[in-house]
């Protein structure tokens, strides 16, 4: 699944994405989600990230193997995402990339690693 964000990204925007992914009929089998922040100018503040983290932790019970690739080149968005990653919600299952191609290469590599 993929979501594209633009402008100032709010916790409501991210929670909407997480909710949509979790409601997907095949959520337990989904292998990746792409968050495209390339058109975003600002990201969620730290307090709101904790709310998103709580939702993600709950979703991991159903699908502990889902990978999340975030796309951005904006230094501010990268900073916010880096802090979110440090919260440990996805156990190294989230990475930030500058292009969709790099993200898909990582997803393919991680998927192959899990099969062996």
Go through each PLM region and give its residues.
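Amphipathic, Lys/Arg-enriched alpha-helical "gate/interface" segment within cytosolic domains
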Residues: 1-116
């Amino acid at each position: 699944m993929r979501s594209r964000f633009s402008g100032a990204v709010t916790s409501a925007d991210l929670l909407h994405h997480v909710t949509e992914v979790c409601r997907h009929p095949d959520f337990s089998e989904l292998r990746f989600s792409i968050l495209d922040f390339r058109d975003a100018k600002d990201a969620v503040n730290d307090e709101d990230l904790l709310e998103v983290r709580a939702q993600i932790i709950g979703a991991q019970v159903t699908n502990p193997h889902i990978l999340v690739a975030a796309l951005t080149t904006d230094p501010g968005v990268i900073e916010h995402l880096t802090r979110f990653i440090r919260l440990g919600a996805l156990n190294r299952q989230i990475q930030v990339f500058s292009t969709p191609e790099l993200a898909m290469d990582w997803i393919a590599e991680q998927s192959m690693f899990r099969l062996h």
